[in-house]
């Protein structure tokens, strides 16, 4: 998508059906430009970091051929959307992380998802600062399965036990009234 937008492309691309955007802020201007070249394209805005190892949210923009006025209702910055399946985007108060921000309130973004990186190689202090146990969940599963099972099972050396971790992204975000997030 970036290459199409950065060049002076003028040729229509009616066969383009999907364009995925991740890694930067997506603007309404860029979406309108792409849709002017490809009226059948569905643009999917996504958010993800190296530490989450994948995109963790999505916001679909329908093709202009299906909904010609959809972008008229959007602000200049396209939302990051909602967490994908089994992903939670938490926006918390910057001074008290025990308070989840209300709609429209700016806060720090945390990601709760399976597949978070274990941490940063040879940077234990940064790992401790950015990868946190979920302080909001007090009901982790019972450890007795590990304690009562076969103590020589080889897999136990690689199993970290039941965990509920959050990644502190360092990004600021807020919730929209419909539940989508803006980063």
Model-assigned labels for residue ranges:
Residues 1-9, 18-42, 55, 86:
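Short gly/Ser/Thr-rich phosphate-binding loop of adenylate-forming enzymes
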